[in-house]
Amino acid sequence: MKFDTVIMGGGLAGLLCGLQLQQHGLRCAIVTRGQSALHFSSGSLDLLSTLPDGQPVTDITAGLDALCRQAPEHPYSRLGAQKVLTLAQQAQTLLNASGAQLYGDVQQAHQRVTPLGTLRSTWLSSPEVPVWPLSAQRICVVGVSGLLDFQAHLAAASLRQRDLNVETAEIDLPELDVLRDNPTEFRAVNIARLLDNEEKWPLLYDALSPIATNCDMIIMPACFGLANDTLWRWLNERLPCALTLLPTLPPSVLGIRLHNQLQRQFVRQGGIWMPGDEVKKVTCRRGTVSEIWTRNHADIPLRPRFAVLASGSFFSSGLVAEREGIREPILGLDVQQTATRAEWYQQHFFDPQPWQQFGVVTDDAFRPSLAGNTVENLYAIGSVLAGFDPIAEGCGGGVCAVSALQAAHHIAERAGEQQ
């Protein structure tokens, strides 16, 4: 099977790269093994929250300039501040075109409220998520009886420290009792599958309506809206106060929805989606990828003009840690890592950990190297890249988006030259 591009990995980076390549008229396939890290995320995307020296970032342009000085090997630093901003804006447009109407400004970070009621600087958030400063003084944090994925009293306690009048309440929906037989099934995603049924909407409205008359804003867990935000908008139009949603413990309704919106858009535009499959081997000839062999297609290889590695980091097995070191398991690409295992980590758990910055070695076009030689038609994007700490620096989603679009533009340019 011949394709212009085969993307190995169906997470945020892989999907955005595929969508951008489709804009250039290229035929793409995505091979994906299972759920991506988006399923376990908040659904918000960070661009750059903190510099390596610990300074918080609010002005993104100034932050990117400082990052270039402090971390010259960071994926952003390789592109330059203006290029990063341009690609980030393109990514936001691409997300909106896919139905993910995310709120945010590429030039200025905003602060969203987290499930614990604290504030986190971010780039893009779902419109349901409350952002600081809140537009209300009297707030009620509402939990769902029996839901262990969200603790209303913890969020309320944090918000009270910000001089807000915050109460807590709990709603009990007997219609959810069918999920209570097994506590592990009473999770936000399963509740959403039930509440998203339009017949159940009035039940949720009836439960929230008495609470809404005594406050200016309701904050509750995101336990509905798996496909879209229609129910949230329906409730906001009818309740006498604002309704906002906080992401829960994984799996996350907002994260799954974002992934599904991108995946459906990719398929709608003619992309080939290969779920439940796994790349077992990649054949390289004369420094280029010639064939990709997957588990489900056995002896039928995929033959791409270009290939993209978007396999993720340790969480997605895009990188594997062994006693001897860190390796990239599909091709055995060169990996940037510390010389000894003892240098992988810091003693204090909450300190920035060196292993977070491990990843494949690439050139400035994000083409990785194998035994010191660049693989000419292969690009590495997203969390598999080296040189950044997505947790400490708050840049995971941004690096995925920016590197994906940079690789897509580079591939499209080269594909046009080869025609």
UniProtKB/Swiss-Prot annotation:
Task: Report the domain of life of the source organism.
Answer: Bacteria
- InterPro entries in UniProt: FAD-dep_OxRdtase_2_FAD-bd, FAD/NAD-bd_sf, G3P_DH_GlpB_su
Entries under Gene3D superfamilies matching the protein: FAD/NAD(P)-binding domain
Q: Provide the catalytic activity annotation.
A: a quinone + sn-glycerol 3-phosphate = dihydroxyacetone phosphate + a quinol
Q: Where is it found, in Gene Ontology cellular component terms?
A: glycerol-3-phosphate dehydrogenase (FAD) complex
Q: In which pathway does it act?
A: Polyol metabolism; glycerol degradation via glycerol kinase pathway; glycerone phosphate from sn-glycerol 3-phosphate (anaerobic route): step 1/1
For the keyword Calcium, the answer is no
Q: What is its EC number?
A: 1.1.5.3
Return any one Pfam family short name: FAD_binding_2
Q: Does Nucleotidyltransferase count among this protein's keywords?
A: no
Q: Give this protein's Gene Ontology molecular function annotations.
A: glycerol-3-phosphate dehydrogenase (quinone) activity
Show the HAMAP family listed in the entry.
Glycerol3P_GlpB (MF_00753)
The entry's family comment says: Belongs to the anaerobic G-3-P dehydrogenase subunit B family.
Q: What does this protein do?
A: Conversion of glycerol 3-phosphate to dihydroxyacetone. Uses fumarate or nitrate as electron acceptor.
Q: What is this protein called?
A: Anaerobic glycerol-3-phosphate dehydrogenase subunit B
Q: Which gene encodes it?
A: glpB
